[in-house]
Amino acid sequence: MAETSTSQSAAPDTGTYAIVEASGQQFWLQPNRYYDLDRLQADVDATVTLDNVLLVKDATGTTLGKPYVKDASVELKVMAHRRGPKVIVYKMRPKKKTRRKNGHRQELTRVMVQSISVGGKSIS
């Protein structure tokens, strides 16, 4: 009996997305998904617009900015302010009685991507 397997080596099609720069990092954002960014100075349920869009992909093709895509923006809705997981930092000097233990929790903002627009026209 012969067995057939259907495996694809190519990555699945992700549809519309944008790569944006926020808080010194680059994020791959898709419409109607939520993401955790570094703490934003915005109230819960407020709308935040990111204009530092590096790349936009939609059904018509891919637009790459040099460095940013002209007239492109991503609208985000602030869902909640939260804190990340605790990270323990432990420093010790060998053969001395010096030990220091610190904990850190990053302040985060959970956002939902409302829309991605290029040239004033929403593509998502």
Swiss-Prot record:
GO terms for cellular component: cytoplasm; ribonucleoprotein complex; ribosome. This protein binds to 23S rRNA in the presence of protein L20. Keywords: Ribonucleoprotein, Ribosomal protein, RNA-binding, rRNA-binding. It comes from the Bacteria. This is Large ribosomal subunit protein bL21. GO terms for molecular function: rRNA binding; structural constituent of ribosome. Belongs to the bacterial ribosomal protein bL21 family. PANTHER family: 50S RIBOSOMAL PROTEIN L21 (PTHR21349), LARGE RIBOSOMAL SUBUNIT PROTEIN BL21M (PTHR21349:SF0). The gene is rplU. NCBIfam families: L21. One of its GO terms (biological process) is translation. Part of the 50S ribosomal subunit. Contacts protein L20. HAMAP family: Ribosomal_bL21 (MF_01363). The keyword Ribonucleoprotein applies. It comes from Synechococcus sp. (strain WH7803).
